[in-house]
């Protein structure tokens, strides 16, 4: 059908009705501007409508591209709407109510200037001028990037409707025709607003408003013949002068054509004559009798014209055309003329064509320089639209427009169907009913109950359901009735509501006018309740829908260059039409049901054929067989028809705009047909094509079944029969199913998607790296009544199609004009190509997935899967995503696995596995598995991740990197699930040592955090023992000691493996760190336990092996992550190059344990020292213990570590001093530390004080801990004397007994001369035998006893000290006392010496 381009095809009506909330009109009242004639106030006019197109609406880069205004008038109300096919206009609908005035039919005229859009309005008493901004002046930039913009009506509220400059009463001048409804208005070249009205005498009244920005007053002029000569020249004389009884010459229809500084006013009058006036010259330039062009005009000449209409069309190249409709009873005639000008300002009409029609009531017609479009409304309330090319159509054959029929009057409901569900499905099926009809029916059905009718599609459905159910229940009088009775009652009320809606739908579908844009050739039908668009039919649809009489006269050469082929196709179409007309409703439902239930269409067709043959009472099948015999080559004809309907293509459409195009061009093109209206129209066009083609394919299947039945009759040979059965039949069925699927998609509503669901979906798609695929919506909620096809067109397909259309323009884009029939045909064709199931791309499915339409996607794939083997893997993948969302995870996994087999064969899957940098790192299947695993991970399905990764391992084969990745993945998710054994097993199978070590580290950390230490310890760690020890050690040294128990874990690890020495080493290191880093009581407690555990470990080893290596300083200070050590200048200190190894034996550990216990004792007694006790040495601890009064503990510590007890005694002596001179507070505090030291006996007398107890404790220690040189006595006395404390007698006596000479020296050191004198005296007496036992002298001086001695040096020092102050008499006495004692001593010594010598001599 290559020659089909020259065919004048039929058009199809596509409703552009709003399905969402009713259009929101902003209402304004135009108040009464003065007193006018009361006679006009009662005039009622019929509803009318009209439209205006912008001059540059067809330019590709114009701000007014695809933009137009349409309006409707009804009584005193004018509704104005601005539409755009590219953008959603805001505030684009206004309703003006004219107080006390009615708007004339056709009394709205719109003009545009460079800066303004000016609306001129005529009512029965006034004229008005509305001045609005031009779209080109509303935006600073020509490049509009938003998807919506403000309408020119946005600021109409600022207009002063009573401004006398723009509103004027029509003066009550004589001769103004009171009953006339025609009018005209225009803008002069000077900006004046001119309004033309017919006069009763046949002239024209013109009311002029000065330019809006120039002061002035309104004026009125009447155009009439001013001289008899002019009347004779023009052949016109007013009726009153003629005096005959012929028809009046009052104008029935006015039209204006502006030329430079003049305006021609054309008036088609009741006397069937056309008059042309010059406004500038105020004279009639031409009169033409239209009856001259009417074949039978005798009756018309005597009667006044009533339904004549006049239209103008101007072409810069061809001039001005006039279209005249001459109305006559039961017939009508169109005459087309061209205005011809001659010299001397004389004009004539050149008759171009006369076209006849049998339709009676012409509602409106539109004229272009080539075509006439006509709108009729017949007696059966049917709307009829036709068009004709008046230049080339010699036969006068009108081309039909297939109007959108009203929904079925009755809905057939089977017994197994719910009436409410079926009626709601019909009421809310996209394209069936408009929102306004549903709202009006709801209002009536509720008997005027106040209801909020500003409802969304879903809200309206709920309200209707509630209203009908309430009405039903209100009518029930009986409490009990059968289910059948209830069903009958339910069906009755739903049928009643449905009939009400149907009635309003019919009323709102009443046609009012045609709106034709000659720039773009777009034709719209303005109806009472909505707007519809007329689009051309495809060749196949045109032939199938064409009435029989048109099909018979169809030019065969336009179908094919081969006349025989063309005749065969026409005969085939005729046969299909005959089958289609014979198919009953039940048969049609059978085929639809078979497609929906995934049953064989061929079998359904065979069943329908059998039913057709069975019920064929009018011998239709015989007629079809007879008609088939006229087809010379049925196989070729059927193949030609199938090819024409098949949109399968091997080449995928380009994605995105050509980057070589400038940004402003790409941005501008990206908005073409971007409005919701355009999207709806395009998708309705696709639905119309799919519906028609579905019927064609259905009838074709039935016909092929018939051909099969006929067998090798005269029609087909055996070879052809086989071909028809095997080839054509199997090609037709997928075609039918494809169109069924597209038809289903065009009626399947998209669902609302919450923002959080969209965000979650976006996260999943970002994991798959599909967020830039173009199949995603721009973060907005899906409109409730939007179909999934509209969603796809708006979000994805539109940009693809537009970029494809303008990728290789035939002319520069700036010069490209938009032709609506061509564009809508191309756009619907490419959209069908993108939707075609067997084409390689699957953008439609991807769009549904990207926009969270999961239920619809599942249904679509279910309808597609059994018969379409294209994109199988992509479908399985997307179905898997749907199952993920619905929670059917095993089904999802199964789908993902099935899709893997198609990787590398399908475009979507190839794009899915393509990495961002384009680098192929593994096989395609492994890349696919990686993406799916990441998706499952993000969704949070570890079980599925494990299963899929396990399956993918087989695919990995010898690829050790992929093996490592997959096994790591398995390990990770087993670990997350708490499958510790499986996680360890997976860990051991990772071939990459680096990954294995990372996983091992993770295993250790996670099991520690979960406190699942038994598993961690008991795993065998074959070939991983050192690694796990190293990991635990590094973790132990890197983390906080009190919140993590890695040391204890490592201890258990070694104990479990009987490695006691390492276990002891671990616990010893743990204890060391606790002391240094954990300055708490709990830390000290743990430190003791650690050392005790280390001791136990060494005791389990044979003595010769019971040792450990002192943990190096690096175990504590050089840990990973520790900050570098610096000197006082801030520079890093160099690490020591060599370290000495220190061996610790059991004894050393016992000492450390003892020290740890002592630390704990001290900490419990005095918490303030906790911070320093933990890391203190034994010597430091001794001082701390003494300071705290824990003298028993201090002595024990000193003995353990072989430390001198001197600090202990000094400390106790000091405390005694403090108590000696302290107050009550000191006494009270002393009891606490005294209680911690065990005294030899308890003194229970009340007289005993803390001071006494302290001295007694000191005395006890001195008696208990004796040393060879009496060091402790010395240090205690020294301490006391240094603080000026008198020595207690017991201490003096105690020290005298052990070292009186040292006591003397101490007295001398502290200048205690009198005490020294007393001591010397007593000492000399003791030596001489008087009280010798108090000085520890066993044998006093005698000849038989051992030798005795006196500390002469100290005595000499004493005498010297006493003699230094000779003025002190007391000193002299003391000195003399000593000298006397010494003299006495010397005498006795001398005597004893002699006795000794005597004895020796014997």
Swiss-Prot record:
Top-level taxon of the source organism: Eukaryota
Entry keyword set: mRNA transport, Nuclear pore complex, Nucleus, Phosphoprotein, Protein transport, Translocation, Transport
Main location: nucleus
GO MF, any single term: structural constituent of nuclear pore
Phosphoserine PTM positions: 10, 456, 915, 1123
A Pfam family: TPR_NUP160_120_M
Keyword Protein transport attributed: yes
Compartments, record wording: Nucleus, Nuclear pore complex
Any single biological process term in GO: mRNA export from nucleus
Gene Ontology CC terms, in alphabetical order: nuclear envelope; nuclear pore; nuclear pore outer ring
Keyword Nucleotide-binding: no
Function statement: Functions as a component of the nuclear pore complex (NPC). Involved in poly(A)+ RNA transport.
Assembly: Part of the nuclear pore complex (NPC). Forms part of the NUP160 subcomplex in the nuclear pore which is composed of NUP160, NUP133, NUP107 and NUP96. This complex plays a role in RNA export and in tethering NUP98 and NUP153 to the nucleus.
PANTHER family per the UniProt record, alphabetical: NUCLEAR PORE COMPLEX PROTEIN NUP160 (PTHR21286:SF0)
Protein name as annotated: Nuclear pore complex protein Nup160
Native species: Mus musculus (Mouse)
């Amino acid at each position: 059908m290559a020659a089909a381009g020259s065919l004048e095809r039929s058009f199809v009506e596509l409703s552009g009705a709003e399905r969402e909330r009713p259009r929101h009109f902003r209402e304004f009242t135009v108040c009464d501007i003065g007193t006018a004639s009361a006679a006009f106030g009662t005039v009622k006019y019929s509803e009318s409508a009209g439209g205006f197109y912008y001059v540059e609406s067809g330019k590709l880069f114009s701000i007014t591209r695809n933009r137009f205004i349409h309006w409707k008038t009804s009584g005193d109300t004018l509704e104005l709407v601005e539409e755009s096919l590219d953008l959603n206009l805001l505030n684009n609908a206004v309703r003006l109510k004219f107080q006390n005035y009615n708007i004339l039919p056709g009394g709205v005229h719109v003009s545009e200037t460079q800066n303004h859009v000016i609306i001129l309005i005529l009512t029965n008493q006034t004229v008005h001028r509305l001045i609005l901004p031009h779209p080109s002046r509303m935006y600073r930039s020509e490049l509009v990037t938003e998807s919506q913009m403000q309408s020119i009506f946005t600021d109409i509220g600022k207009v002063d409707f009573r401004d006398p400059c723009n509103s004027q009463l029509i003066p009550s001048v004589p001769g103004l025709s009171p009953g006339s409804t025609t009018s005209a208005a225009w803008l002069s070249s000077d900006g004046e607003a001119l309004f033309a009205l017919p006069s009763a005498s046949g002239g024209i009244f013109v009311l002029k408003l000065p330019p809006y920005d120039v002061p002035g007053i309104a004026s009125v002029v009447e155009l009439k013949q001013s001289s008899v000569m002019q009347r004779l020249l023009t052949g016109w004389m007013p009726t009153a002068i003629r005096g005959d009884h012929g028809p009046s010459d009052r104008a029935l229809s006015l039209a204006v054509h502006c030329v430079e500084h003049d305006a021609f006013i054309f008036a088609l009058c009741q006397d069937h004559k056309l008059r042309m006036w010059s406004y500038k010259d105020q004279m009639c330039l031409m009169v033409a009798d239209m009856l001259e062009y009417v074949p039978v005009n005798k009756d018309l000449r005597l009667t006044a014209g009533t339904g004549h209409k006049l239209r103008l069309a101007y072409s810069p190249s061809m001039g001005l055309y006039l279209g005249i409709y001459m109305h006559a009873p039961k017939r009508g005639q169109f005459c087309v003329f061209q205005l011809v000008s001659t010299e001397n300002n004389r004009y004539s009409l050149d008759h171009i064509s006369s076209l006849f029609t049998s339709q009676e009531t012409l509602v409106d017609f539109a004229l272009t320089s080539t075509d006439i479009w006509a709108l009729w409304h017949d007696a059966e309330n049917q709307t009829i639209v036709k068009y004709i090319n008046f230049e080339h159509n010699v036969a006068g054959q009108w081309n039909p427009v297939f109007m959108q029929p009203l929904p079925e009057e009755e809905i057939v409901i089977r017994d197994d169907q719910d009436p409410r569900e079926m009626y709601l499905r019909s009421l809310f099926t996209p394209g069936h009913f408009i929102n306004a009809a549903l709202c009006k029916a709801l209002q009536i059905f509720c008997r005027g109950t106040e209801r909020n009718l500003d409802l969304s599609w879903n809200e309206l459905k709920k309200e209707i359901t509630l209203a009908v159910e309430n009405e039903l229940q209100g009518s029930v009088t009986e409490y009990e009735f059968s289910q059948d009775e209830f069903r009958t009652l339910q069906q009755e009320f739903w049928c009643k509501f449905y009939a009400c809606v149907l009635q309003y739908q019919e009323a709102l579908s009443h046609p009012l006018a045609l709106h034709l844009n000659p720039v773009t050739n777009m034709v719209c039908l303005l109806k009472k309740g909505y707007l519809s668009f007329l689009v051309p039919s495809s060749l196949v649809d045109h032939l199938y829908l064409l009435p029989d009489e048109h099909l018979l006269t169809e030019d065969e050469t336009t179908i094919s260059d081969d006349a025989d082929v063309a005749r065969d196709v026409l005969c085939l179409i005729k046969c299909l039409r005959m089958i289609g007309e014979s198919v009953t409703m039940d048969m049609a439902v059978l085929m639809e049901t078979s497609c929906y239930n995934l049953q064989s269409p061929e079998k359904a067709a065979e069943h329908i054929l059998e039913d057709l043959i069975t019920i064929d009472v009018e011998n239709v099948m015989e007629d079809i067989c007879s008609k088939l015999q006229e087809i010379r080559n049925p196989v070729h004809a059927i193949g030609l028809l199938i090819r024409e309907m098949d949109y399968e293509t091997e080449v995928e459409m380009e994605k995105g705009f050509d980057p070589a195009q400038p940004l402003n061009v790409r941005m501008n093109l990206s908005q073409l047909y971007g409005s919701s209206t355009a999207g709806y129209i395009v998708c309705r066009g696709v639905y119309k094509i799919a519906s028609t083609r579905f019927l064609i394919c259905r009838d074709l299947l039935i016909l092929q079944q018939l051909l099969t039945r006929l067998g090798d009759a005269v029609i087909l040979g055996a070879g052809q029969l086989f071909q028809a059965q095997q080839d054509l039949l199997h090609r037709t069925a997928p075609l039918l199913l494809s169109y069924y699927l597209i038809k289903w998609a065009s009626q399947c509503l998209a669902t609302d998607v919450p923002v959080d669901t969209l965000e979650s979906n976006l996260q999943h798609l970002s994991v798959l790296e599909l967020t830039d695929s173009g199949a995603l919506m721009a973060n907005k909620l899906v409109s409730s009544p939007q179909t999934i096809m509209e969603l796809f067109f708006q979000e994805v397909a539109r940009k693809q199609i537009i970029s494809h259309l303008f990728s290789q323009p035939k002319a520069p884009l700036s010069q490209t004009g938009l032709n609506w029939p061509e564009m809508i045909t191309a756009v619907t064709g490419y959209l069908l190509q993108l939707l075609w199931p067997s084409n390689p791309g699957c953008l439609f499915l991807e769009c549904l997935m990207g926009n969270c339409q999961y239920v619809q996607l599942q249904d679509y794939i279910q309808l597609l899967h059994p018969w379409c083997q294209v994109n199988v893997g992509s479908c399985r993948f997307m179905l898997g995503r749907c199952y993920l969302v619905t929670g059917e995870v095993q089904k999802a996994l199964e789908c993902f696995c099935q899709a893997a087999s198609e990787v590398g064969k399908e475009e979507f899957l190839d794009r899915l596995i393509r990495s961002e940098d384009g680098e192929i790192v593994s096989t395609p299947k492994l890349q696919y598995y990686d993406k799916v695993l990441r998706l499952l991970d993000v969704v949070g399905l570890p079980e599925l991740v494990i299963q899929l990764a396990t399956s993918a391992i087989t695919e990995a084969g010898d690829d050790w990197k992929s093996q490592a990745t997959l096994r790591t993945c398995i390990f990770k998710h087993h670990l997350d699930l708490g499958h510790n054994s499986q996680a360890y097993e997976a860990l051991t199978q990772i071939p990459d040592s680096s990954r294995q070590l990372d996983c091992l580290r993770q295993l250790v950390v996670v099991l520690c955090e979960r406190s699942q230490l038994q598993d961690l310890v008991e795993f065998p760690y074959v070939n991983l023992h050192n690694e796990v020890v190293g990991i635990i050690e590094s973790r132990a040294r890197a983390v906080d000691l009190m919140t993590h128990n890695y040391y204890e874990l490592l201890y258990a690890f070694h104990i479990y493996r009987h490695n006691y020495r390492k276990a002891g080493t671990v616990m010893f290191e743990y204890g060391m760190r606790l002391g240094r880093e954990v300055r708490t009581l709990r830390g000290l407690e743990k430190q003791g336990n650690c050392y005790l555990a280390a001791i136990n470990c060494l005791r389990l080893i044979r003595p010769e092996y019971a040792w450990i290596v002192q943990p190096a300083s690096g175990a504590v200070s050089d840990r990973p992550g520790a900050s570098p050590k610096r000197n006082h200048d801030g520079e890093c200190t160099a690490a020591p190059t060599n370290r000495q190894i220190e061996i610790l034996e059991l004894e050393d550990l016992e000492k450390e344990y003892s020290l740890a216990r002592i630390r704990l004792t001290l900490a419990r007694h005095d918490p303030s020292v906790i911070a320093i006790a933990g890391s203190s040495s034994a010597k430091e601890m001794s001082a701390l213990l003494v300071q705290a009064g824990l003298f028993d503990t201090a002595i024990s510590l000193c003995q353990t570590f072989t430390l001198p007890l001197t600090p202990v005694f000094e400390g106790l002596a000091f405390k005694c001093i403090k108590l000696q001179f302290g107050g009550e507070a000191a006494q009270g505090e002393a009891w606490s530390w005294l209680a911690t030291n065990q005294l030899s006996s308890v003194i229970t007398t009340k007289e005993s004080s803390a001071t006494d107890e302290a001295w007694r404790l000191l005395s006890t220690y001195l008696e208990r801990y004796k040393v060879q040189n009496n060091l402790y006595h010395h240090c205690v006395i020294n301490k006391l004397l240094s603080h000026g404390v008198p020595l207690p007698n017991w201490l003096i006596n105690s020290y005298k007994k052990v070292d009186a000479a040292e006591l003397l020296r101490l007295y001398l050191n502290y200048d205690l001369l009198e005490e020294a004198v007393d001591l010397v005296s007593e000492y000399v007496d003791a030596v001489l035998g008087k009280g010798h036992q108090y000085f520890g002298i066993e044998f006093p001086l005698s000849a038989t006893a051992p030798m005795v001695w006196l500390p002469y040096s100290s005595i000499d020092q004493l005498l010297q000290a006493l003699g230094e102050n000779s003025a002190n008499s007391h000193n002299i006495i003391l000195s003399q006392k000593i000298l006397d004692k010494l003299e006495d001593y010397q005498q006795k010594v001398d005597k004893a010496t002699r006795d000794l010598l005597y004895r020796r001599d014997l």
